[in-house]
Amino acid sequence: MTQMEMARKGVVSDEMKKVAEYEGVDVEIVRQKLAEGRAVLPKNKLHRIERPMIVGEGFSVKVNANIGTSQGFSSLEEEKEKARVAIEYGADSLMVLSTWGDLREIRRAIVEMSPVPVGSVPIYDSAVRSYQMKKNVVDFSEKDFFDMVIAHAEDGIDFMTIHVGVTRRVLDRIKSSRRVLKIVSRGGAIIAGWMIKNNKENPFYEHFDELLDIAKDYDITLSLGDGMRPGAVVDASDAQQFEELFVMGELVERAREKGVQVMLEGPGHVPLNEVEMNVRLMKKIGKGAPIFLLGPLPTDRAMGYDHIACAIGGALAGYYGADFLCYVTPSEHISLPDVEDVREGVIASKIAAIVADVARGNKKAWELEKKMALARKNFDWETMFSLSLGKDVAKKKYEERPYPDKGCSMCGPFCAIKIAEEFS
């Protein structure tokens, strides 16, 4: 049985117990949300996960970190180090999005070492294999769509991005649209190119039941990818984006009927004033399914600092109901991220998630804020460092300019906390 099917039958799995303990909630709440499809617990039957996560309504906002190779940069050891650093700094899941080297070796290695759920985009493999065989990136068969999904499932992948909403109708609309950037989703572009070349419907959409059968066999959580997401704030919230969303909303019900866990992916470039509308619409059309957002970025002019823009958009999106934030690194739109980029990206998105949790009244988040306040009151630096996301940076800065008494070198003898303590 899938986690959803177990939940519907009143069965509480070990993973449900673990996430309930982590969230600080009764396991019955976990079971109920999973049964309703308002939360997902990504866990392939073949993958042993030490730190499972629950994503959805009523739970803490989660953060995903993308890693993976690219042409000219295909070191397995570097990707393993990226994974290690991402997890160390608080990533709740990883996605392996490699497009060069031995993709299966890399994927299996990350799944084997990862204590958290691992996701992927299977269609990349089809395109990469075609390119490496000196063919066009869309020169693969309809059968390849599903063969790659099975291969990823057999390798222990817990959740998969499937761009099922890129239909012929949606594609026709995008061709005549006034968008500046027509398609910016790599998976969406590959599928769109295949559809145009072969003059066929998207196999993932046309044969969605076959996809559901595979997902159910392995208990793969389907992340319905938004292949028509806007790639710039000037293109945000247009007809193409929402038409695809309506397709995805219809498929949520079909997945639930089959007992397959499902979530919706959302736009990555959204002006701040449209974030609330986008999140609420996704929740409504998706019948309360969890929402997985890339960012979102509320400006396109932050190159080199896109992780900061991402944190701003992500915090607001999380407050309005987004459940899962995909990080963005300082290298976004520029180059393949290195290990340091991964660290910076995870910290920025974790800040956004924490800000959202506090604003939403998450009990655990507020308890940690109280601990930090008390540590500051008591000048308990070690506790402050331990509660901080960037504890190594915080400690380094403190030690670089030390102060011999209570407080720090910012205020010295004029520390407000110390003065108030002395004269109160």
From Swiss-Prot:
GO terms for cellular component: cytosol. [4Fe-4S] cluster binds at C408, C411, C415. GO terms for molecular function: 4 iron, 4 sulfur cluster binding; carbon-carbon lyase activity; zinc ion binding. Keywords: 4Fe-4S, Iron, Iron-sulfur, Lyase, Metal-binding, S-adenosyl-L-methionine, Thiamine biosynthesis, Zinc. It comes from the Bacteria. It catalyses: 5-amino-1-(5-phospho-beta-D-ribosyl)imidazole + S-adenosyl-L-methionine = 4-amino-2-methyl-5-(phosphooxymethyl)pyrimidine + CO + 5'-deoxyadenosine + formate + L-methionine + 3 H(+). PANTHER family: PHOSPHOMETHYLPYRIMIDINE SYNTHASE, CHLOROPLASTIC, THIAMINE BIOSYNTHESIS PROTEIN THIC. This is Phosphomethylpyrimidine synthase.
